[in-house]
């Protein structure tokens, strides 16, 4: 028996008995050791958005200070900073001169896309942080960006109520989609030629079938739907400013499950208001999701059997406005982008909060 054949057979045996990465993701999550949570600081103003590289080695974050930082996950070191510029220097500054409020990284880790309040989309080479292209065309702040998985097709959403499709390889605009009746507050996509959006105060979630030039309209939340994330190709999670978190199927026009006041309430007795849900995240192709607000906690949830309901797992102490949440591809850690203010405004200021990134290690129950 040749060594290579022996290795192949051994690998087959291991595959038969070892858990797949997918099965590992479905093991029950345990609350993290708080002492192992790290805070990375570098932005002068609140962190507004973040992405994790597909290999889980790096985090890119952006801020109201208009800067973008590339971090090393293991060491916490700042590897590169793309400085923000002053308003009015757009013609000569390489980078953003307005609050950066959304970003996406291609599934092969080659391209980073960032969008700002000044209607601009910037494309960067993720490895070097070299500026490649600038996309113009939106007539309002760019509020959502997502690369279609397995491609370099980029979807963008804006407060101008439109979605645009771009081909980054060709540095080209493809088409514009219309339908929302209010500003679009969030966008996500998977591997299919479609994207999902949250429509703010038009109270709708929409699934856009790009090739068919059609859209599905879903109704559920009573207030502004502010964030949305794919769980898998069939399900998604949303958060709203009425404090609710909802679980959806692309096959049903109403939520499968809604948790009201998911982060509790605040205010004087009789005048309590729910904490807004400012960020949601999903561990891709698993049953684990997370939500963030400004109640000093990130809440983790398990999607119940058949994705019919949301079960609270545990909360993680995180001080400040949780403006962005992302699970690593492996499911081994969660990153929260936080700030003293909400990413889109200055309604409140939490002076005791730090502007930065919380790296939260995730542990799972060991198999028997």
Regions found by a protein language model. Name each.
Residues 1-45, 338-339, 346-351, 361, ...:
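Intrinsically disordered terminal extensions that flank WD40 beta-propeller domains
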Residues 36, 46, 55, 88, ...:
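WD40/WD-repeat beta-propeller blade-loop signature
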Residues 57-60, 109-113, 122, 131-133, ...:
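Structural hallmark of WD40 beta-propellers
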